[in-house]
C-alpha cells in the first residue's frame, strides 16, 4: 500500500512548539506535550483576576462564590443535578479539538485509542507537577476543591456585560473608599478644595541605571528570569549535540579563564625578573658608608642605626649631593615611607640641658630592621609602604576591574536615586506650600466671619441687657420663662408669619391679655381666649414634632416694663407732672371703651383675624392659612433668604414691626392698669382708724367742694360760715384748719383722732 505523502506528512515542529501552521496562536492537543498543565497557576495572570479570569465567577465546581450576574447560573445548577447530565459530563477537563486536516483517519483513530487508554492517563498523572490544595473559602462548606477548572461556555455579549459590571463595582468601591462620609460641607458655603496628595508612593516608578557588571543585577532578577534562562538552556541543550557541550561550557567560562590566566602571567613576570632596589635606599646606603660624610652622618656603635649630626650643615652640604633638594623634613618623610623610624634618645633632644635652643647639637637617629651595617643583602627587603589598593594589585586579585565597575555602577545608581528623591521632595514641598496657602486663606475668611458674628452677638447682648435688665442672664442661660411669671416680668410669645406673599391672611398668633377680675371691676366684658394657631390637621400630623416646632417658631416677644423704661422722664412716676402722669393714662384707658375697641380692631386686622369671626368658613380659612409651612430656621436666616424679593422682605418686616409695637403698647397699658388697680385696692384695704382725722371729716361735712366763698357766707374769726347752716361743735375741736394768732400769722391746727376727741 502506497501512502499519500501530501496527506500523511506531519510537520515535526508541531510537536515541539505546540502550534499548527494554520492555527495561529492555538494551543496543541494534550498528546503533543502532556507534561504542561495549562489550567495551573503558572499561566494565569496575577494582576487582573477580576477582569480576565472567568473561572472566578462562572465555575460552579470551584470553591469560590458563584456569579450572581450570570443569567445561565440557575440553568447550570439544574443541569448538574439532573442524572442525565452526570453521564454527559467528561471526567477530564475538555480540551480544544486538534486541527486534523493534515492527518488521515488512521492517525486520528490511533491517537484516539492512545488517549482513551489507561496507560496514557497514568503517564499524564505521573508527569504532572504536584498540586497544592488551597485552603477552602470562607462561605463554602465543601472541604475539597477540584483539581481542574471547567470554564462555563458563555457568549461574547455575556462576557462584555460581566466586564462592565465588574468595572463599575470596582470604580464605585474606589470612590467610596477615597472619600467616604468623613467630610460634610455647609449648604450655604462653597466646598473646600481637597488637599493634594503626596506623590511619594504613587509616582515613584523610577528604574535606576543597571550596568552589566552590577552585582545586584543577579539578586534583583526574579524567579521568572531564572525559569526563562533554564528553559532556554534546556532548548539549547536539546538542539546542541553531545559533542558540542564542552565547547559551549568553554564559551560560557571563557571570561573567567582569561582573567585567571592574566593574573598568573603577571605573577610569573614579577617573580622571574631581577629585583631592583629603590634608588632612595641605595643613596642612603652610600651616604652612610662614605667616610667623607662621617662628620654629618655615620653608623651607630651597634651598627643597627645611623645618626645625623649638625642638621643645618647636613642640609647645606650632604643633601644637595644626593638629592635635588636640601629640605630636611622631606628627607625624614621619605625615610618614614621606606620603613625607617626615629629613635628618641634620652641624652639628646630637648631633654638635654646643654643642647642649643635652635637644636644644632640634637642628634637624629633612625632605625630600620633591614638596614644593618655590612648586610647589603637585606636591602632587597626594604620596599616602599603601599596602600590597600596597591596591595590588592600585588596580591594578584583578578576581580579588581569587575569590583571597580560594580562600585561605579552602585555609585551611579545611588546618585540617580538621590536625584529622584530630591525631585519627589521638591514636589511634596510645592504641594505643602499650596495647601498651606489655601489653609491660610480659609483661616482668614473664618476669622472675618467670626469677627462679624462677634459684633452681632455683642449688639444682641447689649439690647437684651437694656430691655430685660438683670433678668437677661436667666434668659440666656436657658432657665425658661417660668421665673418671669411675676407682675413685673410678664412674657408673651410672638410667632412671625411665614415668609410669602403679603396678601395671604395672617393668623393671630397671640390674643391681647385679658383679666377677668379686672374686667368685672371696670364693668367690662373679658375678651374670649383664642385657640392655638396650629390647626387640628397640623396637630395630628405633627404629634411627634410639637415641641421642636414650637421651639423653632415661637419666639419671646420684647415687652415694655416699668423697670426697663424707667429712664424716660415721661414714663417715670416720680418725675411725672399731674397733667401727663401714668394714672391719667390708665384712667383714660379704663374709662374710654372706644379707644380700647379701636386698638383691638387695629391689632386684629394687622395680625389677620377679624373681630367676631366665629363662622366655619373663617375657621377653615384660618386653618388653611395656618397650615402653610413655616420656616424652622432662625430669624436672621429668614430675613436673608436668597429667593425672597427685597420689597416683600421689607414689607413683611414693616408689618411685623408695626403689629409688634401696637401689641406691646397694649400689653404695657394693661399691665400698668392692673398694677394701679391692685395698688388702689391694697391701699383701701390697709386704711386704719389711726389715720382718721375728725377735723378734716367735719370740715368736709360743713363745707362745699367749691374753693370760693358763697354768697350767704361770712367770716367768723377767720372761719367760713353760712347763714342758717348748723355748725357741729365738739369740745376742743377747731372748725377751721388755719388760726390767726395775735401777730396775724397763720398756724396749722393739730389733727386729732377719734381717741383724742373721746378723751375730752
Curated annotation (Swiss-Prot):
Residues 19-31, 38-88, 515-539, 701-722, 731-742 have a biased composition (Polar residues). DNA-binding transcription factor that specifically binds heat shock promoter elements (HSE) and activates transcription. With HSP90, is required for the modulation of the chaperone levels in response to growth temperature, rather than the activation of acute responses to sudden thermal transitions. Activated during infection and contributes to full virulence. Homotrimer. Homotrimerization increases the affinity of HSF1 to DNA. Interacts with HSP90. GO terms for cellular component: nucleus. Disruption phenotype: Leads to lethality. The modification Phosphoserine is found at residues 570, 576. Residues 1-132, 206-276, 492-545, 560-582, 609-630, 674-760 are annotated as: Disordered. The gene is CTA8. The keyword DNA-binding applies. It comes from the Eukaryota. This is Heat shock transcription factor. It comes from Candida albicans (strain SC5314 / ATCC MYA-2876) (Yeast). Activated by phosphorylation of at least Ser-570, Thr-574, Ser-576 and Thr-577 in response to heat shock. Additional unidentified residues are also phosphorylated in response to heat shock. Induction: Induced during exposure to the weak acid stress of acetic acid, through the regulation by the transcription factor MNL1. Changing residue 574 to E: Mimics phosphorylation and increases thermotolerance.
Amino acid at each position: 500500500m502506497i501512502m499519500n505523502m501530501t496527506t500523511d506528512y506531519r510537520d515535526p515542529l508541531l510537536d515541539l512548539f505546540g502550534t499548527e501552521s494554520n492555527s495561529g496562536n492555538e494551543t496543541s492537543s494534550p498528546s503533543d506535550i502532556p507534561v504542561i498543565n495549562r489550567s495551573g497557576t503558572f499561566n494565569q495572570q496575577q494582576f487582573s483576576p477580576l477582569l480576565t479570569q472567568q473561572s472566578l465567577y462562572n465555575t460552579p465546581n470551584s470553591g469560590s462564590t458563584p456569579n450572581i450576574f450570570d443569567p445561565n447560573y440557575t440553568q447550570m445548577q439544574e443541569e448538574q443535578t439532573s442524572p442525565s447530565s452526570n453521564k454527559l459530563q467528561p471526567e477530564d477537563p475538555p480540551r480544544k479539538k486538534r486541527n486534523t486536516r493534515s492527518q488521515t483517519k488512521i492517525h486520528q483513530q490511533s491517537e484516539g485509542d492512545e488517549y482513551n487508554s489507561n496507560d496514557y492517563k497514568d503517564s499524564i498523572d505521573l508527569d504532572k507537577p504536584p498540586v497544592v490544595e488551597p485552603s477552602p473559602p470562607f462561605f463554602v462548606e465543601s472541604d475539597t476543591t477540584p483539581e481542574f477548572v471547567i470554564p462555563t461556555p458563555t457568549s461574547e455579549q455575556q462576557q462584555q456585560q460581566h466586564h462592565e459590571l465588574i468595572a463599575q463595582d470596582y470604580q464605585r468601591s474606589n470612590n467610596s473608599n477615597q472619600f467616604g462620609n468623613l467630610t460634610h460641607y455647609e449648604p450655604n458655603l462653597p466646598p473646600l478644595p481637597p488637599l493634594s496628595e503626596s506623590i511619594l508612593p504613587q509616582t515613584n516608578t523610577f528604574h535606576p541605571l543597571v550596568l552589566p557588571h552590577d552585582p545586584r543585577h543577579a539578586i534583583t532578577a526574579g524567579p521568572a528570569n531564572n525559569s526563562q534562562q533554564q528553559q532556554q538552556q534546556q532548548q539549547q541543550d536539546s538542539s546542541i549535540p553531545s559533542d558540542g557541550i564542552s565547547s559551549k561550557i568553554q564559551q560560557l567560562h571563557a571570561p573567567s579563564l582569561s582573567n585567571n590566566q592574566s593574573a598568573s602571567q603577571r605573577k610569573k613576570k614579577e617573580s622571574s625578573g631581577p629585583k631592583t632596589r629603590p634608588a632612595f635606599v641605595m643613596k642612603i646606603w652610600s651616604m652612610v658608608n662614605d667616610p667623607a660624610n662621617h662628620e654629618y652622618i655615620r653608623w651607630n656603635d651597634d651598627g643597627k642605626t645611623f645618626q645625623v649630626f649638625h642638621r643645618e650643615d647636613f642640609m647645606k652640604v650632604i643633601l644637595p649631593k644626593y638629592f635635588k633638594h636640601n629640605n630636611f623634613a622631606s628627607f625624614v618623610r621619605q625615610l618614614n615611607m621606606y620603613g625607617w623610624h626615629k629613635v628618641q634618645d634620652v641624652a639628646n633632644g630637648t631633654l638635654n640641658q646643654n643642647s642649643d635652643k635652635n637644636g644644632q647639637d640634637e642628634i637624629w637617629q633612625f632605625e630600620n630592621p633591614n638596614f644593618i651595617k655590612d648586610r647589603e643583602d637585606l636591602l632587597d627587603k626594604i620596599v616602599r609602604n603601599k596602600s590597600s589598593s596597591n596591595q590588592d594589585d600585588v596580591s594578584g586579585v583578578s576581580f579588581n576591574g569587575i569590583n571597580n565597575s560594580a562600585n561605579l555602577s552602585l555609585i551611579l545608581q545611588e546618585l540617580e536615586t538621590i536625584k529622584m528623591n530630591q525631585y519627589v521632595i521638591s514636589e511634596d514641598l510645592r504641594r505643602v506650600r499650596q495647601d498651606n496657602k489655601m489653609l491660610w486663606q480659609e483661616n482668614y475668611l473664618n476669622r472675618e466671619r467670626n469677627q462679624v458674628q462677634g459684633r452681632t452677638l455683642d449688639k444682641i447682648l447689649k439690647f437684651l441687657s437694656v430691655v430685660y435688665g438683670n433678668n437677661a442672664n436667666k434668659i440666656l442661660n436657658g432657665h425658661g420663662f417660668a421665673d418671669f411669671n411675676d407682675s413685673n416680668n410678664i412674657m408673651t410669645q410672638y410667632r412671625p408669619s411665614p415668609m410669602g406673599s403679603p396678601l395671604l391672611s395672617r393668623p393671630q398668633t397671640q390674643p391681647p391679655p385679658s383679666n377677668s377680675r379686672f374686667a368685672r371691676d371696670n364693668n367690662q366684658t373679658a375678651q374670649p381666649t383664642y385657640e392655638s394657631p396650629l390647626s387640628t390637621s397640623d396637630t395630628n400630623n405633627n404629634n411627634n414634632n410639637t415641641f421642636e416646632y414650637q421651639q423653632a417658631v415661637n419666639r419671646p416677644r420684647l415687652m415694655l416694663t416699668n423697670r426697663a423704661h424707667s429712664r424716660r422722664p415721661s414714663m417715670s412716676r416720680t418725675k411725672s407732672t399731674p397733667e401727663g402722669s401714668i394714672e391719667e393714662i390708665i384712667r383714660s384707658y379704663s374709662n374710654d371703651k372706644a379707644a380700647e375697641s379701636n386698638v383691638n380692631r387695629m391689632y386684629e386686622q394687622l395680625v389677620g383675624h377679624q373681630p367676631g369671626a366665629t363662622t366655619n368658613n373663617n375657621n377653615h380659612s384660618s386653618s388653611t392659612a395656618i397650615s402653610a409651612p413655616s420656616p424652622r430656621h432662625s430669624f436672621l436666616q429668614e430675613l436673608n433668604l436668597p429667593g425672597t424679593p427685597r420689597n416683600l422682605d421689607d414689607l413683611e418686616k414693616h408689618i411685623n414691626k408695626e403689629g409688634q409695637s401696637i401689641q406691646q403698647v397694649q400689653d404695657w397699658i394693661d399691665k400698668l392698669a392692673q398694677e394701679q388697680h391692685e395698688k388702689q385696692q391694697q391701699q383701701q384695704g390697709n386704711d386704719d382708724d389711726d389715720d382718721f382725722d375728725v377735723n378734716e371729716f367735719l370740715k368736709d361735712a360743713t363745707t362745699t367742694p367749691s374753693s370760693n366763698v358763697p354768697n350767704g357766707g361770712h367770716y367768723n374769726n377767720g372761719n367760713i360760715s353760712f347763714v342758717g347752716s348748723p355748725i357741729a361743735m365738739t369740745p376742743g375741736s377747731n372748725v377751721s384748719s388755719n388760726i390767726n394768732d395775735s401777730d396775724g400769722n397763720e398756724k396749722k391746727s393739730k389733727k386729732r383722732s377719734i381717741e383724742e376727741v373721746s378723751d375730752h
